[in-house]
Amino acid sequence: VIEITLRHTIIRNIENRMILIPNSKINSATIINSSYGDSSTCAFVDIGVSYDTNLDKAITVMREEIMKHPMLIDHRSADEKKAGVPVVVVRVINLGDSAITLRAWAWASTAINATIMKYDLFKSIKERFDVEKIEIPYPYFNQIVKNE
């Protein structure tokens, strides 16, 4: 927040742009403050793998690559640690037309670090999948031309 007046509020977004919002909108809106209290942020790392993929292997590779990232933090509660919940949870979240989508929950200390970490992880996981021969599929179509 840069300035609050009787008629409007000016905020600066992550791209350093000034946004003028009428207070009537703010009064009736849900406000998300990412820096209030706990600034740690979860980055969802979603990657599609082929239906032929050994899912346990792909999950292990994703978890290992994320655990190596220097911006990763352990965001588990004491109860989660006691229960043996891993620092990085990876789950199947979708069975799509051309891929099985895996999602990893990776925590960083700030929203900026989470964004940087996420983009770094896309690269390192892709490179590791190449080494491990884990396919990231892409949709393709066969076109059939009928002679009439």
What residues fall within each predicted segment?
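Soluble accessory domains appended to multi-pass membrane transport proteins
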Residues: V1-K82
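Solvent-exposed, non-transmembrane regulatory segments of membrane-associated proteins
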Residues: N33-S34, V49, T53, R63, ...
